Amino acid sequence: PACLEREPLTRAVVTGYAAKVTAEDRAVQRDAFIAAMVWGYGRVGYGPSRVERIMAQPGFEEQLADVTRITLEQGGPAAFEHIRQQRKSGVGCLKHLGAAFGTKYLSFLTKAHRESDIAPVLDSVVRAWFAKHAKDVDVRIGGGWTYPDRYRTYV
């Protein structure tokens, strides 16, 4: 979104983009997705090329719309499971989007639209915190979207 060039991209700003999301408006979904990715990658030089690669995949907008609808209606873990099932069946879903960055989008959506069951980000920073402070909880997710039940333990 063009306005990302004018304001610091804080969690509150990205949550504001997510708050505008509906299950129908793909342009707003795309803006919220981009905001979450820019927030996640920060100032690293390879962020834009990775996001462009994801968004250039055939079916990206339809897949993002499905994930968005499921997140809004059923929550982050259901969307996580949907991505896993689509990939496992060979259909594919948001190719090149890993769980660490995909859960950023899910997290902002649930934070903006749900009063409880906020889906957290599932990245190395969060996993390290759990490893240090909640040693009895197994939050390892393997190489991607492979353990939706473990993601549910976060929620």
Short names for language-model regions:
Residues 1-92, 114-155:
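An N-terminal alpha-helical hairpin/helix-loop-helix interaction module that forms a charged
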Residues 101-104, 125:
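Non-catalytic alpha-helical scaffold/packing segments enriched in small hydrophobic residues
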Residues 103-114:
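Catalytic Zn2+-binding segment of zinc metalloproteases
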